[in-house]
Amino acid sequence: MNSQLLFDDLAQRGLIAQTTDLEQLIALFRQPQTLYCGFDPTAGSLHIGHLVPLIMLKRFQDAGHQGIALIGGATGMIGDPSFKASERSLNSAETVAAWVNALATQIQQLMTPHLTQPLVMVNNADWMQSIGVIAFFRDIGKHFSVNAMIQRESVKQRLARPDQGISFTEFSYSLLQSYDFAQLNQTHQCALQIGGNDQWGNIVSGIDLTRRLNGTNVHGLTLPLITKSDGTKFGKTEGGAIWLDAAKTSPYMFYQFWLNCDDADVYRFLRYYTFLSVEQIEQLEATDKAQVGKPSAQRILAEEMTRFVHGQAGLESAQRISQALFSGQLNQLNLAELKQLEQDGLPCRQLAHVSDVVTLLLETGLASSKRQAREWLENGAIRINGERWHELTLAQTFALYDQYYIVQRGKKQFAMVKLAQV
């Protein structure tokens, strides 16, 4: 892709928050270049907030450049203080090492099917662990002005909180990230670092250190921090983060998350997260606004993102579950799909046995009293495993795979019961 077209597309998508000299950057990327983004191991999985920078690496790779994914085995031992309200809890070396391996595997498994050339994977512990503390302070620390560092907004906010402040450990984080850029420039000729807009200060420090150590000019580009139209952080639900690991967030719940995206956000997220052209997204928005009824943008966003993260099989499974809950044809679900619902798709209670339906409705919270439960049954408001239910008793042989009952009240109230295995 033409360099100008690449950066024009990023701008039209709203993916450029801040950048060093844009004209210089466009000129530089007329030839194949290397860029990187860092991911600190703060958990054993990435979440959807990490998808935009990962997808950004793919956008550059599709244009003929080489992306590097840096896993912060060293920086993850400290934690980035940028715009954090309080000091991070430190994790053990064993925990961080396990998370480093998990993230490296996850990024490779996630991104490789979408790339003709795989991302280069690096771990900053590989070079940081070989530097002695005296050498680091002498050779790296001397290039940093404390006066300048404490003027950063992220540091000033912490210093303004007398109950929190900032430790020397976290204050030094910027030096480590800056050295990463200089190291990758030296070993991989890396010319650009990308990251969230909260990383701008660290990126600028890395640009300056690289110039001082290597005598080369490098660049930075930040992505907007993803928020919803109401200003709240995107990617969180009442149940917590939306993870990319299917064992932490099932493909069904992942699909539902995107499907429930607000109308005020969906077209912006299509620009950020998908590879639909800006023209296609604009046409979709115009079509949705012209027709009466539910817009199709959420469905397209959910399909694109679930396919990207969980593959076609994961998407089809999520769609089967959604359709089965809507139609009541729950016997069409396989055991793995029922386990997705058990994991995080429906409120699930585990019971030793089930025979009394009134008790079942009370245990699942679908009725608040025995009288109410009987009324729901008499009025035909209850379905069990898709069948309208009037009886007061229930045989275990009716359980799906001898384990599961899915109980429905009305159109939208669902609960799940799993029978304890003897």
Swiss-Prot record:
Q: Which residues form the S4 RNA-binding domain?
A: 355-419
| Principal location listed in the UniProt entry | cytoplasm
Q: Where does ATP bind?
A: 236
Q: Where is this motif: 'KMSKS' region?
A: 233-237
The entry's localization annotation reads: Cytoplasm
Q: Please give the CDD domains that the UniProt record associates with this protein.
A: S4, TyrRS_core
E.C. designation(s)? 6.1.1.1
Give the GO terms filed under biological process for this record.
Answer: tyrosyl-tRNA aminoacylation
Q: What does this protein do?
A: Catalyzes the attachment of tyrosine to tRNA(Tyr) in a two-step reaction: tyrosine is first activated by ATP to form Tyr-AMP and then transferred to the acceptor end of tRNA(Tyr).
Family assignment from sequence similarity: Belongs to the class-I aminoacyl-tRNA synthetase family. TyrS type 1 subfamily.
What is the protein name for this chain? Answer: Tyrosine--tRNA ligase 1
Give the organism the record lists: Vibrio vulnificus (strain CMCP6)
**What does UniProt list as this organism's lineage?**
Bacteria, Pseudomonadati, Pseudomonadota, Gammaproteobacteria, Vibrionales
> Which gene name belongs to this protein?
tyrS1
